[in-house]
């Protein structure tokens, strides 16, 4: 026959609840850590979008404008006789 006391049952149930709570806490901590890593990666991408991309665009555009005004918009040279 089974000799199962109420205190033993409560102890086993308590152990199951404790193991479940520990697993739940570990899961919450791991998910929070992974979410913080994902947030850091997104912030780095945002920094790339807001800082580096416009800077590169402005650099390329200003280089194009410099070439355009420096090469194509030159004033005609005056001949020596015109002076």
Curated annotation (Swiss-Prot):
The lineage of its organism: Viruses, Riboviria, Orthornavirae, Pisuviricota, Pisoniviricetes. Keywords: Apoptosis, Host Golgi apparatus, Host membrane, Membrane, Transmembrane, Transmembrane helix. Pfam families: CoV_E. The chain crosses the membrane at residues 17-37. PROSITE patterns: COV_E (PS51926). Residues 1-16 are virion surface. Component of the viral envelope that plays a central role in virus morphogenesis and assembly. It is sufficient to form virus-like particles. Seems to be important for creating the membrane curvature needed to acquire the rounded, stable and infectious particle phenotype. Acts as a viroporin, inducing the formation of hydrophilic pores in cellular membranes. Also induces apoptosis. Plays a central role in virus morphogenesis and assembly. Acts as a viroporin and self-assembles in host membranes forming pentameric protein-lipid pores that allow ion transport. Also plays a role in the induction of apoptosis. It comes from Murine coronavirus (strain A59). Residues 38-79 are intravirion. The gene is E. It comes from the Viruses. It is found in: Host Golgi apparatus membrane. One of its GO terms (biological process) is viral budding from Golgi membrane. It is a single-pass type III membrane protein. InterPro entries: E_protein_bCoV (IPR043506), E_protein_CoV (IPR003873). This is Envelope small membrane protein. Belongs to the betacoronaviruses E protein family. GO terms for cellular component: host cell Golgi membrane; membrane. Homopentamer. Interacts with membrane protein M in the budding compartment of the host cell, which is located between endoplasmic reticulum and the Golgi complex. Interacts with Nucleoprotein.
